[in-house]
């Protein structure tokens, strides 16, 4: 199929913080709290909660941790009110960057995000300065395994409403519209498939190739952002050098 997901290129460069399983669970737990407060604690009637639970399971979040987050949000346990904010700006060499934040203190978050940008030669911009370069898409990543037929999986995904299907080195990447993400994900789940990733994210229309010096600076920026408890997601359009390692 047309297009390139760049999943491995970006996934491999997500930063040291993403290797900290507890931090990932904390961030997803905050997403669960927001989803429940917006649509209620029942996944059957709350599509956003279903999506976040799928993301949690793809990250191997224990069921009891998921349930605790749901109870927390539904008032059975003390829950914090979070504000959702997206910051936009430019990394080194003009890399377009979006930063999603869930915070109980937007002044703290704004200061921390601005510091991460400026420390590595980037700058925070105004709303809309780079978001037009991205589209909201569903992305489902499935590990290649013996017995999993590529053609069958592709037809299964496309029949369920997927927009695109990519075969990469070790994974298959299914792309969907934001609207059809839940339908496609549930159809694949019904076939017994497990996901390495299943979430709606901002995907760049085009990627910008960067050299090793820029990659080193930008990775430091990503590490600072992803180590911030308020930062939920960081999206960018950088294409790291082939074989580049931090």
Swiss-Prot record:
Keyword Secreted attributed: no
Alphabetized UniProt keyword annotations: Cytoplasm, DNA-binding, Transcription, Transcription regulation
Subcellular location: Cytoplasm
GO molecular function: DNA binding
One of the Pfam families matching this protein, by short name: TACO1_YebC_N
Gene Ontology biological process terms in this record: regulation of DNA-templated transcription
InterPro entries for the chain: Integrase-like_N (IPR017856), TACO1_YebC-like_2nd/3rd_dom (IPR048300), TACO1_YebC_N (IPR049083), Transcrip_reg_TACO1-like (IPR002876), Transcrip_reg_TACO1-like_dom3 (IPR026564), YebC-like (IPR029072)
Entry's Gene Ontology cellular component terms: cytosol
Protein family membership: Belongs to the TACO1 family.
Protein name: Probable transcriptional regulatory protein CLD_1467
Organism: Clostridium botulinum (strain Okra / Type B1)
Lineage: Bacteria, Bacillati, Bacillota, Clostridia, Eubacteriales
């Amino acid at each position: 199929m047309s297009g390139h997901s760049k999943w491995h290129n970006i996934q491999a460069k997500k930063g040291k913080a993403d290797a900290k399983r507890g931090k990932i669970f904390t961030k997803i737990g905050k997403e669960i709290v927001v989803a429940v407060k917006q649509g209620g604690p029942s996944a059957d009637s709350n599509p956003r909660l279903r999506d976040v639970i799928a993301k949690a399971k793809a990250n191997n979040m224990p069921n009891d941790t998921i349930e605790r987050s749901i109870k927390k949000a539904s008032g059975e346990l003390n829950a914090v009110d979070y504000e959702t904010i997206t910051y936009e700006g430019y990394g080194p060499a003009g890399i377009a960057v979006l930063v999603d934040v869930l915070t109980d203190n937007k002044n703290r978050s704004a200061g921390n995000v601005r510091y991460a940008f400026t420390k590595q030669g980037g700058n925070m911009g105004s709303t809309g300065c780079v978001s037009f370069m991205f589209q909201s898409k569903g992305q489902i990543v499935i590990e290649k395994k013996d017995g999993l037929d590529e053609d069958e999986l592709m037809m299964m995904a496309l029949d369920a409403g997927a927009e695109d299907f990519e075969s990469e080195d070790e994974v298959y990447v299914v792309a969907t519209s934001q609207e059809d993400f839940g339908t496609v994900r549930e159809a694949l789940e019904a076939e017994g498939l497990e996901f390495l990733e299943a979430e709606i994210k901002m995907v760049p229309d085009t990627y910008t190739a960067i050299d090793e010096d820029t990659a080193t600076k930008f990775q430091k920026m990503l590490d600072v952002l992803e180590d911030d408890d308020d930062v939920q997601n960081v999206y960018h359009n950088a294409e790291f050098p082939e074989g580049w390692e931090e």
